[in-house]
Amino acid sequence: ALAKNAAANGFAAIIAAAGGAAHLAGVIAAQTTLPVIGIPVKSGAMQGVDALYATVQMPPGIPVATVAIDGAKNAAILAAQIIGVANPEVRQKIADFKKKMADDVEKKDAKLQTLGVADYLAQKNK
């Protein structure tokens, strides 16, 4: 019922996380016209590879955008980007978030270049 009524209830996208055979995202995608983002979850002997394959290989007409195993953060960012297509405020927040991530990488790189690998890792692991 959630997937069938999601659009009417104001959803813009659905995120579905599942491990193992990971049917959840496909079942949801078959019941809605909204974008569905699948998160394969690490589990079992295959450590989520089976869930990745199950999530990414949907039949024609049942698209599921798939992120990395345990990739919930990227799933949330992708959902925000989908929402941002029609919402300039959300789009700007995503741009600000990505700028901050890039700035953080630049700061870490500068620190790494100054300290060297061994000291950087020693300081990071304190």
Language-model regions: role of each:
Residues 2-40:
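Glycine-rich phosphate-binding loop
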Residues 31-56, 60:
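Glycine/small-residue-rich loop that forms an oxyanion/phosphate-binding "nest" at active or ligand-binding sites
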